[in-house]
Amino acid sequence: SRNPLAPPEHIGENGSIKNSMVALGCEIFGTVENSVLGSNVVVEEGAIVKDAVVLANSVIKAGAVVSYSVIDENVTVGKNAKIGVEKDEKAEIVVLGRGITVADGVSVTEGQKHENDILA
């Protein structure tokens, strides 16, 4: 597959990446663990992405938590929103479709699938 032209990934002073794959153009100011990030994904300060796949051009805003989820392209997860649950053998994955906007502070619980919505 081809990667779009993008600058190298940037890890901010408080950003951390552990056991993850991060594509070109990503900006990491929060925490990314056991995850895969597509190109040009932004994880703002205080945000956590764990056990998740986040596709290109998505933004995880400050204080948001994304766990055990698949996030499609061009998704915005609002400040302090909570997507998914901690991964365990009984947990069900959350899927957010392309272009969804999750409002600040919204929780999306396990096993949900949303396509082309604004979650407020």
Predicted features by range, described:
Residues S1-A120:
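Left-handed beta-helix
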